[in-house]
């Protein structure tokens, strides 16, 4: 279904409700630059990590799993002995993800809960695609520490985020380029403006430097930029 949510006034802050869940796949592909390329990189680096895993049944988490697209791609590419768990705070997203998994006969578990309250199991891989930016900034380090503690030695965290620049002019230019990208995907200026207003104080991005510093402070031994396009980036961090 095509994303037309912001063609009219929604009169509230952005939230991952049933209306958003119904068009979320289209919203992702039209709102996140090079979405499919990043997904392909995630599958590749998860595969590399699991090749050296010593876990009898490796565990992969997707935090903010939305409609399950990432875990579905991983389940089709990785060993059948891998356990997949998706966590999301939106029941509407969980319901849609579960239906997709059933349709593809994929063995994926989905849990509806708050990430900040969840007790992570020992895991080999944790993916957080465009989800940390919706966590209050002061709460992100504690969540990342829980993730780090649950990861096995050699395990990885993959983080994709919208990012800011500390340079005022460059930040404005990057925003302008992203607006142009969304227009190229068929969104109108009005839709773009309304969504930006709805996301105000809901999505709080960090800079690339801030994200890397936060991961270093947690204790990750290696952190690299896996992908970067203007104000979007994907990081991989190894324990």
Swiss-Prot record:
EC assignment: 2.1.3.-
Keyword S-adenosyl-L-methionine: yes
Residues the entry annotates as binding S-adenosyl-L-methionine: 35, 64-66, 114-115, 129, 196
CDD domains xref list: AdoMet_MTases
Superkingdom of source: Bacteria
Catalysed reactions, semicolon-separated: prephenate + S-adenosyl-L-methionine = carboxy-S-adenosyl-L-methionine + 3-phenylpyruvate + H2O
Pfam families from the UniProt entry: Methyltransf_25 (PF13649)
InterPro entries attached to this UniProt entry: CmoA, Methyltransf_25, SAM-dependent_MTases_sf
Keywords annotated in UniProt: S-adenosyl-L-methionine, Transferase
GO biological process: tRNA wobble uridine modification
GO molecular function: carboxyl- or carbamoyltransferase activity; S-adenosyl-L-methionine binding
Subunit structure, as described in the record: Homodimer.
PANTHER family: CARBOXY-S-ADENOSYL-L-METHIONINE SYNTHASE, TRANS-ACONITATE 2-METHYLTRANSFERASE-RELATED
NCBIfam families: carboxy-S-adenosyl-L-methionine synthase CmoA
Family the UniProt entry places it in: Belongs to the class I-like SAM-binding methyltransferase superfamily. Cx-SAM synthase family.
Protein task: Catalyzes the conversion of S-adenosyl-L-methionine (SAM) to carboxy-S-adenosyl-L-methionine (Cx-SAM).
This protein's name: Carboxy-S-adenosyl-L-methionine synthase
Source organism (scientific name): Helicobacter hepaticus (strain ATCC 51449 / 3B1)
């Amino acid at each position: 279904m095509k994303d037309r949510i912001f063609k009219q006034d929604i009169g509230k802050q952005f939230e991952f409700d049933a209306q958003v869940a119904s068009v979320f796949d289209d919203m992702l592909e039209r709102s996140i630059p090079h979405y499919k390329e990043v997904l392909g990189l995630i599958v590749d680096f998860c595969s590399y990590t699991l090749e050296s895993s010593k876990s009898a049944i490796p565990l992969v988490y997707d935090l903010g799993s939305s409609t399950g697209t990432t875990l579905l791609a991983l389940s089709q590419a990785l060993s059948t002995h891998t356990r997949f768990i998706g966590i999301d705070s939106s029941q509407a997203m969980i319901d849609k993800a579960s239906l997709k998994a059933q349709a593809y006969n994929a063995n994926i578990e989905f849990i509806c809960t708050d990430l900040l309250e969840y007790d992570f199991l020992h895991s080999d891989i944790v993916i957080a695609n465009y989800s940390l930016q919706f966590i209050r900034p002061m709460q992100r380090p504690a969540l990342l520490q829980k993730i780090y503690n649950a990861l096995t030695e050699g395990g990885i965290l993959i983080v994709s985020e919208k990012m800011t620049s500390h340079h005022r002019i460059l930040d404005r230019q990057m925003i302008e380029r992203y607006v142009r990208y969304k227009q190229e995907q068929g969104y109108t200026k009005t839709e773009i403006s309304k969504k930006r207003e709805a996301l105000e104080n809901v999505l709080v991005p960090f800079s690339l430097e801030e994200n890397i510093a936060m991961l270093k402070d947690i204790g990750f031994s290696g952190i690299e930029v896996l992908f970067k396009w203007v104000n979007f980036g994907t990081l991989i961090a190894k324990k």
